Swiss-Prot record:
GO terms for molecular function: DNA-binding transcription activator activity, RNA polymerase II-specific; DNA-binding transcription factor activity, RNA polymerase II-specific; sequence-specific DNA binding; transcription cis-regulatory region binding. It is found in: Nucleus. Residues 320-329, 552-561 have a biased composition (Polar residues). CDD domains: SAM_PNT-ETS-1_2 (cd08533). ETS transcription factor with a prominent role during development of the eye and the nervous system. Required for glial-neuronal cell interactions at the ventral midline which are necessary for the proper elaboration of commissures in the embryonic CNS. It comes from Drosophila melanogaster. InterPro entries: Ets_dom, ETS_fam, Pointed_dom, SAM/pointed_sf, WH-like_DNA-bd_sf, WH_DNA-bd_sf. This is ETS-like protein pointed. Residues 466-484, 505-517 have a biased composition (Gly residues). Belongs to the ETS family.
Length: 718
């Protein structure tokens, strides 16, 4: 066996060798040193042989080793020779020569082994049982499946869960006829609501004593902090959250009510509550037999008790009537905070002396009938004596009666906005409705007594046209009015809508009986929806004299100077079928309803209810507007090259600063079903007049282009 001696830095203690002794000590104890060295070398050799036996091979030095290898005598024999030699000093020197050498194991001869430490597997731990495993399965079945568990991991918000839990209150509201607005609750309603919440949410510790003799208004006015102070912990949060949700539901804008037709009104009319109703009349003691007919025609879902309403929210009508252009106060200005819409609703009432019924129907008659009677008698009279202004109008005799201001038709506060939406829905589904006797109310049909004439309540006229703006014609059908869906585009309280529509009832009938509109044009006579909205809209401002506008403030903007009243839309033609006078007037003056002209171009200056199609036609005939709207040269087809500019001008015209193309396009889409304007397929912002516009204006598109020196630029439209 051979051992390889490598690297010369072998320490003296590597093989537990004793440290080198001084020469004097070594000479004195040579035998002891020899015996000790021999003992340690024998022990080291024995351990090396055991290590070789384990590894199965000897440690051999490589051939390239530069170290001095030991020859035939092994290291054991050399070390043993030290003990047997007599020269002790030579033995010590030999040990000193070799003490710095170090024995190492060559890496190429040592087998490497991977030593594994015992570890737990990554997924070896057993999961703890979840709460769902511990919980009672039978108890979990009692949780409503519609409500998600109130855990942090749920995807539903807590507010949505609360709304779902409050859904049962809607049934209680309908069952007990409770108003949705908590501010209108009586003391009984408050206690009923608290008892419902106590049973619904198992509020055992709920104390109702602080809420006795407390109305809904007072409860809401407490505020959240005071409300929580008189309710148990956590219970008050639930109750206040419900109150907050109910109030927010009642404060939604009107556009959510009228099926998405969001007209921008100056009022903040709401679904529920007399605080926000468009028209609320005081509750008089006069008997009225028309309440049953109103309730039978209108949805009972919108009927609330008048006794629960706060009388301070009512606005009484003016106790005098308008005879011609009355220069006195025409609407109640006592309450300066009254919104313009409510001021407009304060119109005088009319008692139909020729009606079949004997009861007082003052507020059932629209203000337009009274105004029509007065204007037909004497439009310049300022006499306020109502008994001296009896006149005949198309077979019906009506007498203005301001002394009996019997606004007793509103014993139940009816949400007329929602009611009009119901009429709108039903009338849309009636095919072939005809516009019979728009303004005359004659021909044996006592239209004045129609309890569904919503215009008498101050309802915006484009909605009232569905119910009250229609008369009973020869066919017995009801006119749809054709104006409800255009609510975004015809402002209900436009600052430029004036008293120029004075003769709202007389000219439309054109005859004594039969309800004919007096229109000689065959095509337009058969399409009453085309112009039916004029009757409803003109009646809305009939009660205003020329010096007053629906807004007391200055109007937003105007496209031109305000002309005189006789130069306005419908100065002598209000409620007349447009074709009846458009065909009799010249193009410059009568193309768009008696507009004034600027440089030979018809220009509607802002008075009277202009419709969107008329406005577009006006722009198309204005040479200065060709940069944003122009004819394409294909018949009556036109393109909005800059739709935002068109929408901006339309907003200026209708006093709607927030008008944009999205809202304007809704008005254009409304014309699709009425066959007035169609969208050209495959072309962006390109539309076409599909009505008989040529027969209406008496000119072809080419003639209009030549007359007004318009340029037709055929462009590639995408």
């Amino acid at each position: 066996m051979e051992l390889a001696i490598c690297k010369t830095d072998l320490s003296a203690t590597k093989f537990m060798l004793p440290p080198a002794l001084p020469s004097s000590a070594a000479i004195g104890s040579s035998s002891a040193v020899a015996s000790t060295a021999s003992h340690f070398l024998d022990k080291a050799a024995h351990e090396l042989f055991q290590l070789n036996a384990i590894n199965g091979h000897l440690f051999k030095s490589p051939a390239s080793s530069h170290l001095n290898s030991v020859g035939s005598p092994s290291i054991l024999s050399q070390l043993n020779g030290i003990g047997n030699s007599g020269n002790h000093s030579g033995q010590v020197s030999t040990m000193r020569l070799k003490k710095n050498r170090k024995v190492t194991f060559l890496s190429s001869l040592v087998e490497s082994k991977n030593i594994f430490i015992k570890e737990e597997p990554i997924h070896g731990c057993k999961d703890l049982c979840s709460l769902s495993d511990i919980s009672d399965h039978e108890a979990s079945l009692e949780v409503p499946t519609a409500l998600p568990p109130l855990t942090p991991g749920t995807n539903r918000k807590v507010n949505e869960v609360l709304k779902a839990s409050f859904a049962s209150w809607e049934k209680e509201v309908q069952k007990c006829n409770i108003t949705k607005d908590p501010r209108e609750w009586t003391e009984e309603h408050v206690i009923y609501w608290l008892n419902w919440a106590k049973n619904e949410f198992s509020l055992v510790s709920m104390n109702l004593d602080p809420f006795y003799k407390m109305k809904g208004r007072a409860m809401v006015d407490l505020g959240k902090e005071k409300f929580l102070a008189i309710t148990p912990p956590f219970t008050g949060d639930i109750l206040w959250e419900h109150l907050d949700i109910l109030q927010k539901d009642c404060e939604k804008p009107n556009e959510d009510i009228v099926h998405g037709n969001s007209f921008e009104s100056a009022t903040t009319a709401s679904v529920c509550g007399s605080d926000h109703q468009v028209a609320n009349y005081p509750n008089e003691t006069h008997a009225n037999s028309n309440n049953s007919s109103i309730n039978s025609r209108l949805s009972m879902d919108y009927v609330t008790s008048a006794g629960n309403s706060d009388n301070k929210n009512f606005h009484r009508a003016t106790p005098h009537s308008h005879n011609g252009y009355n220069t006195s106060n025409t609407h109640d200005r006592i309450n300066n905070s009254t919104p313009p819409q409510q001021q407009q609703s304060q119109q005088p009432t009319v008692n139909g002396s020729g009606s079949a019924s004997s009861n007082n129907n003052n507020s059932m008659l629209p203000p337009a009938v009274q105004q029509s009677n007065n204007e037909n008698n004497n439009t310049s009279s300022s006499n306020t004596n109502n008994s001296s202004n009896n006149n005949n109008n198309s077979g019906g005799s009506n007498n203005s009666n301001a002394g009996s201001n019997n606004n007793n038709n509103n014993n139940n506060n009816i949400n007329f906005m929602a009611a009009a939406a119901i009429f709108q829905h039903h009338l849309k589904e009636e095919p072939g409705t005809q516009n019979g006797n728009i303004g005359g109310y004659g021909g044996g049909s006592n239209s004045q007594n129609d309890p569904t004439d919503l215009s008498s309540y101050g309802l915006p006229a484009h909605l009232a046209a569905y119910g009250g703006g229609s008369g009973s014609g020869p066919t017995g059908g009801r006119s749809s009015g054709g104006g409800g869906d255009e609510s975004d585009y015809h402002s209900t309280i436009s600052a430029q809508d004036h008293q120029s529509q004075q003769s709202s009832g007389g000219n439309g009938s054109g005859g004594a009986s039969g309800g004919s509109t007096g229109n000689s044009n065959g095509y337009l006579d058969s399409s009453s929806e085309f112009y039916g909205s004029y009757a409803g809209r003109n009646r809305f401002h009939d009660g205003y004299p020329p010096e007053f506008t629906p807004y007391d403030a200055q109007s937003f903007q105007s496209m031109g100077p305000q002309p005189t009243a006789m130069d306005q839309w419908g100065a002598a033609h209000a409620h007349q079928h447009p074709a009846a006078y458009m065909s009799t007037l010249g193009l410059d003056k009568g193309l768009l309803g008696g507009y004034t002209t600027q440089g030979g171009v018809p220009c509607f200056t802002g008075s009277g209810p202009i419709q969107l199609w008329q406005f577009l036609l006006e722009l198309l005939l204005d040479k200065t507007c060709q940069s944003f709207i122009s004819w394409t040269g294909d018949g009556w087809e036109f393109k909005l090259t800059d739709p935002d500019e068109v929408a901006r001008r339309w907003g200026i015209r209708k006093n709607k600063p927030k008008m944009n193309y999205e809202k304007l396009s809704r008005g254009l889409r409304y014309y699709y079903d009425k066959n007035i304007i169609h969208k050209t397929a495959g072309k962006r912002y390109v539309y076409r007049f599909v009505c008989d516009l040529q027969n209406l204006v008496g000119h072809t598109p080419e003639e209009l282009v030549a007359k007004y020196d318009l340029k037709i630029e055929k462009k590639d439209v995408d």
